[in-house]
Regions:
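Intrinsic low-complexity, intrinsically disordered or marginally ordered coil/linker segments
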Residues: 1-211
Length: 211
């Protein structure tokens, strides 16, 4: 689970939203050649609008990855840095484009929040650096990136124009919760609330766990 809250003027937020949701040449190439539909609907994003695979590798990018069921194809393309799996993992930090993405909020009210899912990891520093350039150009005020893996570990990174930041900086990070207190501290329901056979030592009524 990922979210990026962006604060700024109506003009700056509208500019960022338009950049994230536009149909670019990479998307048009993908669609024209019968590949996965990369066209984002309104208020949906594609990572390629922030950090796009260079046009000279597009043909190789969309060829089968090393995970092909054909052994010869797998051998041919495995461990190359130009197929979609390797390029995305290296540059975006995750193997897929933004999943289940949406943008909520009204630029006129001074804030937008971008929601999206990634495969097992947050987006890369390289991706965030490219996104920070967009924020600078659009003259956005600030942004906070929140990421959390389904097991519970995660973190937050921030960018603030008033601090003359060029890049996102780490604000907070946390490990997988390992106690009832950890869950409460983060405002989450402990696993003991939905798993009768699992309790931490500090869970309420832990004495009754084995009865």
């Amino acid at each position: 689970f990922n979210s990026i809250r962006i604060d700024g003027s109506e003009e700056s937020l509208t500019a960022v939203r338009n950049i994230l949701t536009k149909e670019n040449d990479f998307v048009r190439y993908a669609n024209a050649n019968g590949h996965r539909d990369y066209s984002p609907e309104r208020n949906k994003i594609t990572f390629s609008n922030v950090l796009c695979p260079p046009s000279e590798i597009w043909e190789e990018y969309f060829m089968p990855s090393g995970f092909s069921n054909d052994p010869e194809i797998a051998k041919m393309y495995n461990n190359t840095d130009t197929n979609w799996y390797e390029w995305n993992s290296e540059h975006w930090g995750t193997k897929w484009d933004a999943c289940e993405s949406r943008i909520e909020g009204d630029p006129a009210e001074g804030s937008l929040t971008i929601y999206f899912e990634t495969a097992w990891s947050p987006v890369s520093t390289e991706f965030l650096d490219a996104f920070a350039e967009i924020l600078n150009i659009a003259n956005v005020t600030s942004a906070v990136y929140h990421y959390e893996e389904e097991q519970g570990w995660g973190g937050e990174m921030g960018w603030d124009k008033d601090l003359d930041q060029q890049y996102f900086r780490q604000i907070d990070e946390w490990d997988i919760p390992d106690s009832h207190a950890d869950y409460e501290l983060r405002g989450l329901d402990c696993v003991c609330t939905y798993m009768d056979d699992f309790k931490y030592d500090d869970c309420p009524n832990v004495e009754s766990a084995g009865e």
